[in-house]
């Protein structure tokens, strides 16, 4: 993407404040135009002094002009600051809302730390561009457009020096940008690596402490930081060289203007005031050229950050739901999978032609070896992914034809990892239903057998649970997650290995709460502990993404198939029980 396109797209975000931004820009253009009068007035003062003319009127005019210019600049800058800060805040919340609403598959592919880093850096970069646009960018272009013809009207010979200076600035900037383009892109990649490493290490700090990896991870970060600097230093060297060359060019230009001006004054072709005024013009021009150089540098350094952000934004919009999707309402809970297939591009795992139907209120246990596709199946039901083949119907409606939001309104999920936010117990339970009353929230906690431990806490329901609930035990976290699901009161329930990480005593308490939660709900249970699936109306045995066995618990446990073998291996079913069952059936 060209620098112009990067900049133009950045400015489009200001569209929400068109009127206010336009007024600020116009005010800055007026100030830039008025500034041109300063060297002219100064030249007139010099002429008046050297010619012993009346100086006071011009001095008063110059002073008034300086006061007005200063006050106006402060007011305009204040408004520009407010606009830039306001737009940054709204962009952050808008982009956050779009990103967090994306399917989980998108987040798994993109990476949480990558999206976060891209968003935060882009917001700061855009803030700087917006601020400079309203303060300097356009006014600098206008000032240059006015300064050159005004200077030429005063003296073509001196103006030629300034034009050559402008060309020198342009050539230096172009050469340096071409030399550092790849280097700057490499710098941004290294920044992403550093941020990802820090984020990954901090989020897994308990593992690092457990395995004494603190020094190793710190050493790795230092290595990443050194690579960043190795990529950054050559870029900085080129821009330092550009700054030195620009300074040299402007110094030479001023010396040439002074020499030529002195010669013209001595020959009587110009007055001293004209030369002084022209030197003022030259200083203004050099200042504006420096601003243009800074502007070009700013855009150049922003390019990689903003291109990443634009790619992020575009991928979000590409994955947004079709406008025609409707809402699903009054769900009873009847579910049907019709030849559903799904695969991951970088893995052989997935689902292949899965078909089954569940009546409203039934409980389905999904079992099978690791990697069989159990979690993928329930993720497809919740539209974490969309099927690549076949259909999933809820009450006869294809779920790809309804919005994810309306579908998930009717599904409550209890994960193996409870997934608590670093907020109060009350806030975490209320995630189940927005606007739930205090009474409903407490009733859900009681139904989940969570009220007893909550009441022992000093702050009770206002107790903060810590990051990911680390101030609570595993059983306590899980009961809060169950309370959240009870409060949601959805007709479809998904239990994704909800008790596999609990001890036997805690599991018994949590299971009682889950049994209460399952009543009159269509329930999908993923469990490694096969003792939890005895009460299922249907058992699906998955292997390699296919349903290899399907039926009731008693039916499959006595069929001498894969499920029965798994029960025997886990000690739940003995060979003697299988023989007795076969004898009974034969009789």
Curated annotation (Swiss-Prot):
A Pfam family assignment: ABC_membrane
Top-tier EC class: translocase
Subcellular location field: Cell inner membrane
Annotated PROSITE patterns: ABC_TM1F (PS50929), ABC_TRANSPORTER_1 (PS00211), ABC_TRANSPORTER_2 (PS50893), NDVA (PS51317)
Membrane-spanning ranges: 23-43, 57-77, 126-146, 158-178, 248-268, 272-292
List of residues binding ATP: 368-375
Source lineage: Bacteria, Pseudomonadati, Pseudomonadota, Alphaproteobacteria, Hyphomicrobiales
EC number annotated for this UniProt entry: 7.5.2.3
Swiss-Prot/TrEMBL keywords: ATP-binding, Cell inner membrane, Cell membrane, Membrane, Nucleotide-binding, Sugar transport, Translocase, Transmembrane, Transmembrane helix, Transport
Coiled coil: none
Subunit composition and interactions: Homodimer.
One MF annotation (Gene Ontology) recorded for this entry: ATP binding
Protein's membrane topology: Multi-pass membrane protein
InterPro entries, sorted: AAA+_ATPase (IPR003593), ABC1_TM_dom (IPR011527), ABC1_TM_sf (IPR036640), ABC_transporter-like_ATP-bd (IPR003439), ABC_transporter-like_CS (IPR017871), NdvA (IPR005896), P-loop_NTPase (IPR027417), Type_1_exporter (IPR039421)
Entry's Gene Ontology cellular component terms: plasma membrane
Gene3D superfamilies: ABC transporter type 1, transmembrane domain (1.20.1560.10), P-loop containing nucleotide triphosphate hydrolases (3.40.50.300)
Record carries keyword Ligase: no
ABC transmembrane type-1 domain span: 21-301
Name this protein carries in UniProt: Beta-(1-->2)glucan export ATP-binding/permease protein NdvA
Family: Belongs to the ABC transporter superfamily. Beta-(1-->2)glucan exporter (TC 3.A.1.108.1) family.
Catalysed transformations (reactions): [(1->2)-beta-D-glucosyl](n)(in) + ATP + H2O = [(1->2)-beta-D-glucosyl](n)(out) + ADP + phosphate + H(+)
